[in-house]
């Protein structure tokens, strides 16, 4: 349960989260200190992962573990997207549990070298920012213009049993993207999407969160650009992957096996 929700950008927000005990009919605060973001239960419902001050934390309702410690505003972000990713790929959570809740993988954004852009803030009316009644304020954030450097991205995972953090080896261009990391039905796999900066070449990888090794499953190359809904609406099952694609000029569904072999186009039309 969350309260005191405050918007950050278009899709992101911070809030205070509480765990509700149905039997005891009581609330317990998820975490003290700064507000939290994207609190998400593990698939086995034993833990909650969330982001606070650009770092990932995991709680079992009683004990809290800080998974990352290098998060810093306008420098390093763990588990939530930077401004570019949130706008370009329409999501606000950049971590995923594995299928049985024993591991969590995330995208790390190093935006320390990205140039800063500043905006003036005024009092306004919805909501009213009274602190800017007499003089405007200023908000500065990392905003790469076209052709400028984006955040440097990397993939990591945390083993809840051992407490070990490892790097996940999923190839991507130096200026490319990881537009999504998703849960897979297989506990030894997370699904990672990569895309080049032109956004006309997308690839799906299965990566083992315990070893860091990855395998390419699907490559989707199109003349113009891969639409965001292709990333958002693809489904990874136990035996098949269902991928939307407009490769023939119209959006259709394509069925693949888990080795990335195309089985068939599911439906047709225009």
Which stretches of residues belong to each language-model region?
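Beta-propeller fold detector
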Residues: 28-31, 64-77, 166-169, 214-219, ...
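Asp-box/WD-like beta-propeller blade repeats and closely related beta-sheet repeat scaffolds
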Residues: 10-59, 63-94
């Amino acid at each position: 349960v969350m309260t005191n929700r405050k918007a950050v950008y278009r899709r992101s927000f911070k809030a205070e989260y509480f765990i509700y005990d149905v039997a005891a009919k009581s609330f317990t605060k998820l975490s003290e200190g700064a507000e939290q973001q994207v609190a998400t239960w593990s698939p086995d419902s034993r833990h909650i992962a969330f982001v606070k001050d650009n770092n990932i934390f995991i709680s079992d309702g009683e004990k809290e573990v800080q998974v990352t410690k290098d998060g810093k505003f306008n420098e390093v972000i763990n588990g939530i997207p930077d401004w570019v990713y949130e706008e370009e790929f329409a999501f606000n959570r950049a971590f995923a549990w594995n299928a049985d809740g024993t591991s969590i993988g995330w995208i790390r954004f190093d935006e320390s070298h990205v140039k800063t852009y500043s905006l003036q803030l005024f009092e306004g009316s919805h909501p009213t920012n009274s602190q800017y009644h007499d003089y405007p304020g200023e908000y500065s954030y990392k905003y790469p213009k076209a052709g400028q450097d984006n955040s440097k991205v990397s993939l990591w995972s945390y083993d809840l049993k051992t407490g070990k953090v490892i790097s996940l080896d999923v190839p991507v261009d130096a200026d490319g993207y990881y537009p999504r990391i998703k849960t897979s039905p297989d506990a030894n796999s997370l699904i990672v999407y990569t895309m080049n900066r032109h956004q006309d070449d997308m690839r799906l990888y299965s990566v083992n969160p315990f070893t860091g090794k990855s395998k390419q499953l699907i490559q989707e190359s199109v003349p113009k650009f891969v639409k965001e809904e292709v990333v958002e609406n693809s489904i990874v099952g136990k035996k098949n992957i269902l991928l939307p694609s407009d490769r023939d000029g119209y959006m259709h569904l394509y069925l693949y096996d888990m080795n990335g072999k195309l089985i068939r186009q599911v439906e047709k039309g225009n």
